[in-house]
A protein has these predicted regions:
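Solvent-exposed coil/turn segments that connect beta secondary-structure elements
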Residues: 60-63, 95-96, 132-135, 146-155
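Bacterial N-terminal signal peptides that target proteins for export
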Residues: 2-15
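Alpha-helix termination/capping residues and helix-transition junctions
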Residues: 21, 49, 121-124
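Bacterial N-terminal signal peptides
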Residues: 13-24
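N-terminal segment of the mature soluble domain
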Residues: 54-57, 65-129, 169-177, 238-251
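C-terminal/domain-edge helix-coil "capping" segments
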Residues: 27-51, 138, 142, 153-264
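Short, solvent-exposed beta-strand/turn "edge" segments of beta-rich domains on protein surfaces
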Residues: 120, 136-138
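Hydrophobic residues positioned within well-ordered beta-strands of beta-sheet architectures
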Residues: 128, 143-145
Length: 264
């Protein structure tokens, strides 16, 4: 009798354990999973009827005052940010470095003419020149970036409806859209400068927005991981600064029809 009771108790215990496992499994299946959220994207203002425009990125100059800033690493982050712009393609940084070596600019560029030569050599519609103005990898990090965009006239327009102006074809370099031939203008079409201090709450807010769709919500650090890693912070800073540059491009092209009206 005692043996039978012992066996019965074991059966009851096993049945209870099995029931608990079933309930736990059901709860796990019904538990809401971390929803996927698409990250924010940058959209270019350029006319896409002829395909994406092509940019080249020159490794930024290190003007931060510290030797630990790597221009090539920051340049790669800028290239990655440009690649994420809808309507824009970007050449790999190594392609640009090879072009600089072939043209004798391995020590860096000194004038806008140097940037133009590199862009013409690569067949790019635009070339992005920049500098690292601040670099502090310690928590909270700081990164300053300045970017200047040089563009081939006619290659980065908002619309193709503008009529051809024969006077513009013989004019000297002026502003975008009214210069001669396919040469690059002497001045950048858009310039931005950002100093992103990780202690600044506005910068933290921008980093959190950038992390949306790019980080795990259930992780311990969540969006703050972009403040804890200088590599990730550099990705954020490059994306933020490139986004500001595109904002300037939207404004520039919004003003373009008014400036071209005299030639219609």
């Amino acid at each position: 009798m005692t043996s039978a009771q012992t066996m019965l108790n074991r059966v009851i215990t096993l049945a209870m354990l099995a029931s608990m496992l079933v309930v736990h499994s059901a709860c796990s299946m019904t538990k809401e999973r971390d929803p996927l959220t698409p990250p924010g994207v940058i959209v270019s203002p350029y006319d896409a009827t002829q395909g994406d425009v092509l940019w080249a990125v020159i490794p930024p100059l290190n003007e931060s005052g510290t030797s630990i800033a790597d221009p090539n690493e920051v340049g790669d982050a800028i290239v990655a940010a440009v690649q994420q712009i809808r309507g824009v393609r970007c050449l790999p940084l190594n392609r640009t470095i090879d072009a600089m070596r072939s043209l004798g600019f391995l020590g860096g560029i000194e004038t806008s003419s140097d940037a133009h030569q590199i862009a013409e050599y690569l067949g790019a519609d635009g070339v992005l020149v920049g500098s690292i103005t601040a670099y502090d990898p310690y928590d909270p990090p700081t990164l300053g970036l300045a970017l200047a965009l040089y563009a081939k006239p006619g290659a980065m327009a908002q619309t193709t409806s503008a009529s051809l102006d024969t006077r513009a074809l013989t004019s000297a370099f002026s502003d975008f859209g009214t210069t001669a031939g396919h040469n690059f203008a002497g001045q950048p079409v858009s310039v931005v400068s950002e100093h992103l201090d990780g202690r600044n709450h506005e910068v933290q807010y921008a980093a959190r927005a950038y992390a949306e769709g790019r980080s795990e919500r259930q992780s311990a650090m969540q969006w703050r991981i972009y403040l804890a890693s200088m590599d990730l912070y550099t990705q954020f800073a490059a994306h933020h600064t490139v986004g500001r540059l595109i904002d300037e491009e939207w404004l520039r092209l919004a003003r373009q029809p008014a400036s071209e009206g005299a030639y219609d």
